[in-house]
Amino acid sequence: MSKIHPSAVVEDGAIIGDEVIIEAYSFVGANAKIGNNVVIKQGARILPNVKIGDDSKIFSYAIVGDIPQDISYKDEINSGVIIGKNATIREFVTINSGTAKGDGYTRIGDNAFIMAYSHIAHDCILGNNIILANNATLAGHVELGDYTVVGGLTPIHQFVKVGEGCMIAGASALSQDIVPFCLAEGNRASIRSLNLVGLRRRFDKEEIDILSKTFKILFKQGNLKDNALNLLESTSSENVKKMCNFILETKRGIPIYKEKNHG
């Protein structure tokens, strides 16, 4: 049985799952759909047309699904936000709804961990197992692949794509696309190395060795796109193919590789 505090506002048309807890002074808008075992803590606001998956927690004063911060937005569609299962949305996070320039929805996959004061703008698409540290700021239409981590105080420019398994260091500023499985750092951020910490959590030594060799071929000799084309023709590794296809399909470009300074 769900528990809804008397001071909370749940508008007509909202669908509330089983064993949901809605704390004092929180708000759930019309046509919102709240999954089972969700906790909405004091003062959080879930706007209309937001879907939140089972076992998620929305912490105090987070605002999910308010209108886009886009000067061209004219209420032209009934937009919203879709969040997967087991999400953690911490205090004062803001997640804006989508626009007609996308499909109308800002989307976040399963197992998201979004730390306090982070911002996810309209039409962003976040995969599964995403971590945003405090004050990470995503502009409109940003895409993050599965298992990506964005460090604190890091802004990401609109339309940037970050591939699967990347690490974006804290206090960086990202304006170009980041190849899957890489670590990027700096202002402006550039690719520095493979994200070896992330790779070791998911892959065996053989696959990591293949990706390490791929990284050297792609970034340390010749033309990046030519290298990607050549590797694509010869590799059987699905992860290498992901890296190569990403390079060939980039629209914002790949930031120039810089050797890490170990001094």
From Swiss-Prot:
Q: Where in the cell is it found?
A: Cytoplasm
What the entry lists under Pfam families is as follows: Acetyltransf_11, Hexapep
| GO MF term list | acyl-[acyl-carrier-protein]-UDP-N-acetylglucosamine O-acyltransferase activity
Q: What class of enzyme is it?
A: transferase
Alphabetically sorted, this entry's keywords are: Acyltransferase, Cytoplasm, Lipid A biosynthesis, Lipid biosynthesis, Lipid metabolism, Repeat, Transferase
In its UniProt record, which GO terms are filed under biological process? lipid A biosynthetic process
InterPro entries to which the protein is assigned, alphabetical:
Acetyltransf_C, Acetyltransf_C_sf, Hexapep, Hexapep_transf_CS, Lipid_A_LpxA, Trimer_LpxA-like_sf
Gene Ontology CC annotations of this record:
cytoplasm; membrane
What are the EC numbers? 2.3.1.129
The organism sits in which domain of life? Bacteria
Keyword presence, Lipid metabolism: yes
Pathway connected to this protein: Glycolipid biosynthesis; lipid IV(A) biosynthesis; lipid IV(A) from (3R)-3-hydroxytetradecanoyl-[acyl-carrier-protein] and UDP-N-acetyl-alpha-D-glucosamine: step 1/6
The keyword Transcription regulation is annotated on this UniProt entry: no
Q: Which reaction does it catalyse?
A: a (3R)-hydroxyacyl-[ACP] + UDP-N-acetyl-alpha-D-glucosamine = a UDP-3-O-[(3R)-3-hydroxyacyl]-N-acetyl-alpha-D-glucosamine + holo-[ACP]
Primary residence: cytoplasm
Q: Which NCBIfam families match?
A: lipid_A_lpxA (TIGR01852), PRK05289.1 (NF003657)
Family per similarity comment: Belongs to the transferase hexapeptide repeat family. LpxA subfamily.
Its assembly, as annotated, is: Homotrimer.
User: What function does this protein fulfil?
Assistant: Involved in the biosynthesis of lipid A, a phosphorylated glycolipid that anchors the lipopolysaccharide to the outer membrane of the cell.
Q: What is this protein called?
A: Acyl-[acyl-carrier-protein]--UDP-N-acetylglucosamine O-acyltransferase
Report the source organism. Answer: Campylobacter lari (strain RM2100 / D67 / ATCC BAA-1060)
